[in-house]
Design a protein with these regions (language model features):
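Surface-exposed, low-hydrophobicity beta-strand/loop segments enriched in small/polar/acidic residues
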Residues: 1-148
Length: 148
């Protein structure tokens, strides 16, 4: 899912996860505690990165837990282009501002037309392509928090 030379993969300082991240490619995560990430389930979660390759823990079903055999890969460098998964809320268009869909609460993204951002919520970046609900689009990872 990562694209070309503009992408960057974290040299896995993240060594614990708070849930099964298998098949969560294109979803947003936030830093929950030191060296530990969790799916961003609402727009107030401070952006950490986008999952490129998901994984489970070494003890599936028990969380927090150490990352499993497969590596967890994320794009977390500002300005990188990454594919993200659009929520069930509706389609997005190129140039839409994307944020975590607080209704689906599963790390997927929606635009500000489908969910108006409130103070303290985060825009994660701009859509670079069009996509329908449940599809993927390209997004430039450029988080910005909404101020008063």
């Amino acid at each position: 899912m990562a694209l070309g030379a503009t992408t960057y993969k974290t040299p896995n300082i993240i060594n614990q996860i708070d849930e099964d991240l298998t098949a969560k490619e294109g979803c947003g995560v936030f830093l929950y505690a030191a060296n530990r990430v969790r799916l961003a389930t609402d727009a107030t979660a401070i952006p950490y990165g986008i999952i490129v390759t998901g994984t489970d823990s070494v003890t599936p079903g028990t969380y927090p837990s150490a990352i499993g055999d497969a590596s967890l890969e994320m794009v977390d460098q500002l300005g990188c282009v990454v594919q993200v998964l659009i929520s069930s809320a509706g389609s997005v268009a190129a140039n839409d501002t994307l944020l975590i869909d607080s209704t689906d609460a599963d790390g997927t993204f929606t635009n500000t037309t489908n969910q108006a951002p409130a103070v303290g919520e985060w825009a994660w970046g701009l859509a670079l392509t069009d996509a329908g609900a449940g599809e993927q689009c390209l997004m430039r990872f450029q988080p910005v928090g909404r101020q008063a």
